[in-house]
Curated annotation (Swiss-Prot):
Residues 1-24 form the signal peptide. The gene is adhS. Keywords: Cell membrane, Membrane, Pyrrolidone carboxylic acid, Signal. It is found in: Cell membrane. GO terms for cellular component: plasma membrane. The keyword Phosphoprotein does not apply. The modification Pyrrolidone carboxylic acid is found at Q25. This is Alcohol dehydrogenase, 15 kDa subunit.
Length: 133
């Protein structure tokens, strides 16, 4: 009797897991919209708060070193109040998620398919932030 139940239970369990995976896939949010062109790693039109968030993203993802990115992150955050606890800052939040707004367009750093390009973009962001400190 036990031999008859085990295959049926295994099949029921397998079907249940498959249906849960399909439901989870249906409920997951759509991917972010495609990048609106390649910014060429030009961060000249990016706000200081957005650059501070980008520095946070780049340091967390290890595209720039802690020693290189954190002084920029802290400097921009202090000077431009990018991380005010009571108010919050949308540009900083965007940057922390890897997004940046430049000249009216929104870009996503992960859209650079090559990790070396993402590193180069983060290093370009460090250079763009230097005059703002």
């Amino acid at each position: 009797m036990f031999r008859r139940i085990v295959p049926v239970l295994g099949l029921a369990l397998g079907l249940g897991l498959a249906s849960q995976a399909a439901m989870a896939q249906e409920q997951s949010p759509p991917p972010p919209p495609a990048v609106q062109g390649t910014p060429g790693k030009d961060f000249t039109g990016v706000s200081p708060a957005n650059l501070a968030g980008i520095m946070n993203y780049c340091v967390e993802q290890q595209y720039v070193s802690y020693d290189e990115g954190n002084p920029v992150l802290y400097g921009l955050s202090e000077k431009y109040k990018a991380t005010e606890q009571t108010v919050g800052n949308f540009d900083y939040a965007l940057g922390t998620a890897g997004y940046f707004d430049s000249n009216g367009k929104r870009f996503y750093l992960v859209a650079y398919t090559n990790e070396d390009d993402r590193r180069a973009a983060c290093h370009a962001a460090v250079k763009a932030a230097q005059p703002m400190l």
